[in-house]
């Protein structure tokens, strides 16, 4: 039984999703968005850190998974996104959680079956997979997708090796 916190980082809106895995079953525990306020980037990063830290305290996850930075058209946006990811990763590290990272293509492939899926397709499949009454908000759905991707990746590793491994700090342990 593992609880996984998935995060879809953003400097303005950071989505989070929490699932519990019981064997092959994935149960929805919660999801939402951390909406930062103000123009001051350091303050927004603190809000992300504090928000993720509170979610960790509330749900007590065993594992943490986050979306990797994608190539943005605007270099400034990519840097801000990287800093938002850093704030979330530090919150997980402070809580001694193993950190796993996945590309958007890996996440979409795990959830929808194709790495080129649209946001609406991810929302729909998350609703179906987790048996939700309605599709979650886009950022929350993406975060739940990160958690589902992490679950499926670990299940594949278990099947291949007979034991689970988690990617942490760029290495497996």
From Swiss-Prot:
The protein's enzyme class: hydrolase
InterPro entries found in the cross-reference section: RNaseH-like_sf, RNaseH_sf, X-over_junc_endoDNase_Mg_BS, X-over_junc_endoDNase_RuvC
Keyword ATP-binding: no
UniProt-annotated location(s): Cytoplasm
Cofactor details (free text): Binds 2 Mg(2+) ion per subunit.
Cofactor(s) the protein requires to work: Mg(2+)
EC numbers: 3.1.21.10
Keywords for this protein: Cytoplasm, DNA damage, DNA recombination, DNA repair, DNA-binding, Endonuclease, Hydrolase, Magnesium, Metal-binding, Nuclease
GO molecular function: crossover junction DNA endonuclease activity; DNA binding; magnesium ion binding
Catalytic reactions of this protein: Endonucleolytic cleavage at a junction such as a reciprocal single-stranded crossover between two homologous DNA duplexes (Holliday junction)
Function recorded in the entry: The RuvA-RuvB-RuvC complex processes Holliday junction (HJ) DNA during genetic recombination and DNA repair. Endonuclease that resolves HJ intermediates. Cleaves cruciform DNA by making single-stranded nicks across the HJ at symmetrical positions within the homologous arms, yielding a 5'-phosphate and a 3'-hydroxyl group; requires a central core of homology in the junction. The consensus cleavage sequence is 5'-(A/T)TT(C/G)-3'. Cleavage occurs on the 3'-side of the TT dinucleotide at the point of strand exchange.
Summary of subunit composition and partner proteins: Homodimer which binds Holliday junction (HJ) DNA. The HJ becomes 2-fold symmetrical on binding to RuvC with unstacked arms; it has a different conformation from HJ DNA in complex with RuvA. In the full resolvosome a probable DNA-RuvA(4)-RuvB(12)-RuvC(2) complex forms which resolves the HJ.
Name assigned to this protein: Crossover junction endodeoxyribonuclease RuvC
Organism: Shewanella sp. (strain ANA-3)
This protein's encoding gene: ruvC
